[in-house]
Amino acid sequence: MNILRFEKAVYTLPILFGSALHIDRVAKIQKYSQSKYNFKLPIHSFYGAPTNSIWNGGRPPYYNDSMVSNKTKQYYKNIDAHKYLTYTNYLAGDYLDDPVSNLALKMLSKDDGVIITDERLHKYIRKTYPKLKTKASVVKITKEQPNERSAEYYNQLLDRYDYILLHPDDNTDLDLITQIKDLSRVEVLIDERCTRNCRVRDLHYDINAQSNIPIRDRDSNIMEQEGTLWSKYCPREKAVVLKNGKEKLDILVNTLDEIQDLYNMGIRRFKTSGRGS
């Protein structure tokens, strides 16, 4: 009897360089599943970035375990999944010599990888760390094509990257997805908590990027920008009224039926959001 709805699907989870407690709990569940049921959980990779990495473009983690140190190599070895560093800062190309970011890469193994926004960083990693896989990030796609993406655009990314993320706005655009040439290398973020067609998504990414670069290089009013974004512009709290009269937040979390449609089309890689949690 098949106990999995999506039998051939694999998942990537947001706990790399997050809480050691979460990593430990997932590891115990993996071991228990293997020993008790002879079943390897379909976790393809963990993703995240060290808190002191300039190349990090997402929410900076603040766990004691999120620093790169002489214990990091063993930390990597203890993880029963591939590791993907979230180096999605679009300003990363200005700091290619960042020692923390480079050290975290050097300790990765073959077929681990990097999630990238900046093409300068992509070229640098291809040249300096050729054993690593590269993945085009949602941030990259948003910065380059904030309003609408074409199949041609996605196919061009597939020519350069090992894997690509689909923009969450496109997760239900089945006509577009059918035109992407290799769905086995497309990953879908299934629980995006931003709203569809958000007009300030790229601004949010700008603020995240600024927050991770040295203080001397940041916009002087970065804190004010962030406050204004959340208080005036972010539409995440907007609700839609359903047919039954109840309200539902207009966010991009996919339903099981929507995931089933993607799976039936040939997509096998699914990603959950978060960062260290």
What are these regions (language model features)?
Residues 2-150, 160-277:
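Active-site pocket-lining/capping segments in soluble small-molecule metabolic enzymes
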